[in-house]
Amino acid sequence: MEHVWKLANRIFSSFITGQCIEAVILGSMFFVSMTILRFPYAMLVGILIAFTALIPVFGGIIGCWVAFFLILMVSPVKAVLFLGLFLILQQIEGNLIYPHVVGGSVGLPSIWVLVAVTLGGSLMGIVGMLIFIPLISVIYTLFREWVYARLEKKQLVL
């Protein structure tokens, strides 16, 4: 049982680290793209989205709406263009970067990260999205260790 607790602690710590790395990547993507496209408040929006992205899935959306209204005060046309930029960057982040970065940090293949977020979100909402990635990772790791031990016992080591 001690092994399970140590494993869960290590995986949850890695998950938090992965979330932070992913948030910095997303904020940087917004800062760079907004600077290139000459949007107002690029640095502020990048930092805002980085902080709100710590909340899985919906955090970026919250940051987007705050940034949208901020940009709307300066330029309504750029605010609408910002929504398009947000959709593009959010798709890249949600489908490519998030599963790879967070999955890599907890030792879970990207497809299982998407399964964990979907399952956790459907069962327990936002809290489930936070809890299910480390939980599925612990189960995945324990199952993998059990399979490897059985294969080793039968001298069928991969």
Which residues does each PLM region occupy?
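Hydrophobic alpha-helical transmembrane segments of membrane transport and translocation systems
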Residues: 80-158
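Alpha-helical transmembrane segments and their immediate interhelical loop/hinge regions
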Residues: 1-72, 76-82
